Amino acid sequence: HPFSVPIIPRNQEEAAEERPPLEGVNLIGAVQGSAGSDRIIVVTAHYDHVGIRDGEIYNGADDNASGVATALALAQHLSRSRNQPKHTFLFVFPDGEEHGLSGARGFLADPPLPVDTLAFNLNFDMLARADNGQLWASGAHHMPALLPLIEEVAAEAPIDLRSGYDGSDEAQDDWTTQSDHAVFYRNQIPHLYLGVEDHPDYHQPTDDFENIDQDTFLRNVDTAIMVAKAIDDQLEALLGLPPLEAPTEN
């Protein structure tokens, strides 16, 4: 899914410059739902990072190889026949998140499916660290119906899953515009963002595999899968719509 989008200027100087558009390629795949619904759950996890700075490679193990790996683990889980979801899951791996969310902007500017079928966005960005043992679900402030779902999953999750960083607490940063889910939010598509708090290796060349606690990461992946399945099960209730009718057998 190639895209070309305008650069968003950060100040008046940049706004006055003529700059070429940002170009990139999003990667897209899908797992078909079983219920025949045209409502699609879009899972996003950006695959780009900041690249090379001053001759040093920034590998981005947490930001965001961890999110990509989580999305792939979810896709693998749902692709097994016994785990087939009710709704179709569209897996989008945006390019250019580190450059003005350009991949997500390009996806919604030219989606492969009608925008009105994109019912929900679940975004994975930085799930490997949780140095304090906490995984955050950001978005319930904008969709209060998500809070009981998060609490329900948290009660069974293998990690300390918490709701916040979405404008609900003035003492916390607001992550609503901090990753690809922001583009869905601006297009009135409900979202939930799973991620961890910043850590000393964030956007540093030390964000490497060796600094990831594997046990914590795997527990975060398991929790993310639980969240995705809960959204699939409860999507109509979250959206205030009638429940899906059970598919009839021919």
Predicted segment positions?
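Alpha-helical metal-binding/catalytic segments enriched in His/Glu/Asp
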Residues: L27-G29, V43-L101, A224
